[in-house]
């Protein structure tokens, strides 16, 4: 299977540069995975497609304002760090730009010295391991000084940091938002619960590997980045009861899907579990837990379009994406959504 099999022509003007004023006013393409039939709706209409007893699985990760712009303590030279993951305590793995300035032992300051970073070592792929020094609580300092790490295809400045968070975000640790969840409002979630639909939560901290292009020709040769996940006992039991009752487990986003499929066993059950996953889902994969999926429109030739093709069928997805381009749907993080039913 070739990576080029997942290519489609995408005009740049269809890449959404900002979120819509109202989260659930985005468009919703409903794709029937069995027939390939397409309906065009608004996201709020998702309510009509959810049944009593179904369980919606949401990723409650919260995006860290992980982009820090500072200067070299000695010379005042500019530096930009993008935090990737906490290693332990105040040590973090990050990307440094320009990397040549971030030599081992160099000290950088942010926010007029409120935060300092010392480069401790150079890791894999040139990533830096840095250690922070600060007064107070790190998360509060980062909230004050950090900027949202918006994807590389978004060029507009984000006016409101919260628009790159889901309304149910809770567990800090992501370098990018689980964007399928951005369409939900508090009111819509209440309506969903009132209809008798269960809501389960898990955590997967989204890494920057999400935006890395696939650099091989053959899909089988691609190696996924790994990301931390957690599913607690209460939510695992809710998902298992749903499967036992013959109801649907509907994943919100590829991150929720990958977590559920990592934990799921051959009998279609999940359990409380934490760890790191590098699961790569592409056509040919048989889903164990996920029945349906709410997702955004993804980049051509990305691992995410491969995942949705595994669930809905490659021909159905490529046809749906070409239809989305023709109908001028908005693409990527701040774009419109798809429900694979």
Swiss-Prot record:
Query: Which is an annotated GO molecular function term of this record?
Result: S-adenosylmethionine:tRNA ribosyltransferase-isomerase activity
Q: What biological function has been recorded for the protein in this entry?
A: Transfers and isomerizes the ribose moiety from AdoMet to the 7-aminomethyl group of 7-deazaguanine (preQ1-tRNA) to give epoxyqueuosine (oQ-tRNA).
Name recorded for this polypeptide: S-adenosylmethionine:tRNA ribosyltransferase-isomerase
List the GO terms this entry assigns under cellular component, sorted alphabetically. Answer: cytoplasm
Q: Which GO terms describe its biological process?
A: queuosine biosynthetic process; tRNA wobble guanine modification
Pfam assignment, any one: Queuosine_synth
**Gene from which this protein is expressed:** queA
User: What keywords are annotated for this sequence in UniProt?
Assistant: Cytoplasm, Queuosine biosynthesis, S-adenosyl-L-methionine, Transferase
Top-level taxonomic group: Bacteria
Q: Which reaction does it catalyse?
A: 7-aminomethyl-7-carbaguanosine(34) in tRNA + S-adenosyl-L-methionine = epoxyqueuosine(34) in tRNA + adenine + L-methionine + 2 H(+)
Organism of derivation: Clostridium perfringens (strain 13 / Type A)
NCBIfam families named in the record: PRK00147.1, queA
Its chief place of residence is cytoplasm
């Amino acid at each position: 299977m070739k990576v080029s099999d997942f290519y489609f022509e995408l005009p740049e003007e269809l890449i959404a540069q900002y979120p819509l004023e109202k989260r659930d006013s985005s468009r919703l393409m409903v794709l029937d995975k069995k027939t390939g039939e397409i309906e065009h709706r608004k996201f709020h209409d998702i309510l009509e497609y959810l049944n009593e007893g179904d369980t919606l699985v949401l990723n409650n990760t919260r995006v860290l304002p992980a982009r820090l712009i500072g200067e070299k303590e000695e010379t005042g030279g500019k530096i930009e760090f993008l935090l990737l993951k906490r290693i332990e305590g105040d040590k973090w793995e990050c990307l440094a730009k320009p990397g040549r300035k971030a030599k081992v032992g160099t000290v950088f300051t942010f926010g007029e010295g409120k935060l300092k970073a010392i480069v401790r070592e150079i890791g894999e792929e040139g990533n830096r391991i840095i250690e922070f020094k600060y007064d107070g609580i790190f998360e509060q300092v980062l909230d004050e000084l950090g900027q949202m790490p918006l994807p590389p295809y978004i060029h507009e400045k984000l006016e409101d940091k919260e628009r790159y968070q889901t309304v149910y975000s809770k567990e800090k640790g992501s370098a990018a938002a689980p964007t399928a969840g951005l369409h939900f409002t508090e009111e819509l979630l209440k309506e969903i619960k009132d209809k008798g639909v269960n809501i389960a939560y898990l955590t997967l901290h989204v890494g920057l590997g999400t935006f890395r292009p696939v650099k091989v020709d053959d899909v089988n040769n691609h190696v996924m980045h790994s990301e931390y996940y957690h599913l607690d006992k209460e939510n695992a039991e809710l998902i298992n009861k749903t499967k036992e009752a013959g109801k649907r487990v509907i994943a919100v986003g590829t991150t929720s899907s990958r977590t559920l499929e990592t934990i799921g066993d051959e009998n279609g059950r999940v359990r409380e579990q934490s760890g790191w996953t590098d699961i790569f889902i592409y056509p040919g994969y048989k889903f164990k837990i996920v029945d349906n999926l709410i997702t955004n429109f993804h980049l051509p030739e990305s691992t995410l379009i491969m995942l949705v093709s595994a669930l809905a069928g490659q021909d159905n997805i490529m046809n749906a994406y070409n239809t989305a381009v023709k109908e001028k749907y908005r693409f990527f993080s701040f774009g419109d959504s798809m429900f694979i039913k």
